[in-house]
């Protein structure tokens, strides 16, 4: 009898793992966490998730040398929509990427999307292999 009670719990145990390893969620792993260009960038901190699975999201950083943050958002949508990935903007700012000096400065806010959590952005950049040796400063 105990075995039957244990078997009833099996769907509750397996379901979270099934969601984590479904093909829709695996596509999130294929999205690079950081894409910024050299020089001064406008950047956005973005929470991405597969439609219907908002609980299993991932935070990414995207930046480009463009006139406004809306242009960065448009490029994000062009990248993610074909994959069926939704994006929620957490905020924006500016990044000065001095690759030759191995320095990055994160500062400012976006007029369109509000300010991003620059400390969180710094942590994401430091976790990325390209920028782990960089000196990253945050100015609010």
Swiss-Prot record:
Keyword field contains Transcription: no
Tissue expr: Germline cells of adult males.
Binding site for substrate: 42, 110-112
Impact noted for substituting residue 49 to N: In strain: ZBMEL131
Keyword field: Differentiation, Sexual differentiation
Active site feature: 69 (proton acceptor)
Superkingdom as given in the UniProt entry: Eukaryota
Positions in coiled-coil regions: none
Matches recorded under InterPro entries: Janus, Janus_sf
GO terms, biological process: cell differentiation; sex differentiation
Molecular function terms, GO-annotated: protein histidine phosphatase activity
GO annotation, cellular component aspect: cytosol
Function: JanA and janB regulate somatic sex differentiation.
Family: Belongs to the janus family.
Protein name: Sex-regulated protein janus-B
């Amino acid at each position: 009898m105990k075995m039957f009670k244990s078997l009833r719990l099996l769907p509750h145990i397996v379901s979270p793992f099934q969601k984590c390893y479904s093909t829709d969620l695996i596509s999130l792993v294929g999205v690079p966490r950081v894409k910024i260009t050299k020089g001064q960038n406008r950047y956005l901190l973005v929470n991405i998730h597969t439609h219907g699975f908002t609980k299993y999201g991932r935070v990414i950083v995207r930046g480009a040398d463009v006139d406004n943050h809306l242009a960065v958002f448009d490029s994000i949508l062009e990248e993610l929509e074909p994959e069926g990935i939704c994006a929620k903007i957490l905020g924006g700012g500016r990044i000065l990427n001095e690759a030759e000096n191995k320095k990055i400065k994160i500062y400012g806010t976006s007029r369109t999307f509000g300010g991003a959590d620059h400390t969180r952005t710094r942590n994401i950049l430091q976790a990325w292999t390209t920028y782990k040796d960089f000196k990253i400063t945050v100015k609010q």
